[in-house]
Amino acid sequence: MKKVLVLGASGYVGSQLLPLLLEQGYQVTAAARHIDYLKARTEPHDNLSLEYLDLADQAATQALVPDFDLIFFLVHGMAEGHDFIDYELNLARNFVSALGPKNQHVIYLSSLQPQTGDSEHLQARKQTGQLLRKGPVPVTELQAGVIIGPGSAAFEIMRDFVYNLPIMIAPKWVDSKANPIALQNLNHYLLKLAQDTPSESQTFEVGGPDIVSYRNQFAHIAKTADRPLRLWATSLLTPQIASYWLGVVTSVPSNIGRALLAGLKHDFIASSTIIREKYPQKLISFDSMVEQAIHSEGNFVKSNVWGFDKTAFKRWQAGYGYYPKKTGASITSSASLDSLWHVAQQIGSPKQGYFFANALWRTREWLDLLFGGGVPVRQMPEGPTLKVGDKIDSWKVIRCEENQFLSLLFGMKGPGLGRLEITVSDHGDSRELNISAWWHPKGFLGLLYWFAMMPAHLFIFKGMVKAIEKQAKEQMKD
């Protein structure tokens, strides 16, 4: 069986492709820069290994890439900001220079190219494909438009707009057309291509069976979610202006969202006859793919990100944002890892409280009555060290890795689902302490709640990391 390398495995398509490759018996290595995120979302498997890889590191790339028969290139640079084209092409160059005699096939997931016009995102995809084909290994480029599935950036942007905006004013591109493809259908093509070893490079366009305007896509998402849709289109609102709302309305990373929006002013209609004849399958209708995506969004809670916690899964509700809002604070310290962890894991104890602004923490507990909660209940772990399942007041420990990581499930009432994370990292000559809050808002009220709480969060978390570090240093002196 082929040895398979998945580059960009922590991304949307890559993370969902991994279990399918394993089911078919491949020996898979998943590589990503965001290796901690990948580990948290991936279940262990005998045929799966996880590797940290930054393709910008040419030496590391050349050490890893040559050992595989098949390579999925699922990398993009949209999260890097305005200069991502040069960044993305540099990654592709490093990858091509690392290809060796053992490599037989590269599968590159790209974007459809419109007949007229383009954007930086589309240009980057096009130029990356051209660069990959200059290498010594046959490349299959799969050009896809909008992918519909839980976690797809384009889908989640539309879904968040429907759930979070009482009134939607859209650019004229809302009447552009596309034939979105279901994630399930895309995976079928990827898995079939994995079985082939072509002698020369090839390119396929892939799309779904229905050509739908973005206006009608919004309408069906709203209908499926049982939400009202009040949408007006105007030429005064450009995709560039609309992109500035992304950080407020949706939790999809803003740089990725802006890159996608810039390309949506074009029609994206795939001509997929060739690949449909070569790898036949029943294509899922647009209506069905939206229904499947919305109804299965909560499944991602069943992952190590949430400690496979049953309480978190039970509390998930339709309408919660797939991607979370996040805020936090960090500090770099000379204190030891052990001392920082020893102090941090005392969170909520009678001695420490929450390290800083305890009155604000207690005030929020009593405000829970306004959200339909009960009178605050004081709860503490039985033992001297924390373990999964322990209760700290209204919080529940859902993950605990000694001297590294602590995750607490938010137990109070609120329009969303949240968790608090404390991370301690050793960087050799220094340590980093990070405290972050993650919030999956439920609709417009969930967003209002998040932004109303953000000033307090920033104030409290900055004070917390300083207080923990101070105590850790004092402990080292004793």
Predicted regions: what is each one?
Residues 193-256, 267-329, 336:
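Mid/C-terminal beta-alpha module of Rossmann-like enzyme folds, strongest
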Residues 287, 446-478:
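A conserved amphipathic terminal alpha-helix motif
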Residues 410-458:
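Beta-strand/loop substructures that line and gate deep hydrophobic ligand-binding cavities in soluble
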Residues 333-341, 345-415:
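Glycine-rich portal/gate segments that line the openings of hydrophobic small-molecule binding cavities
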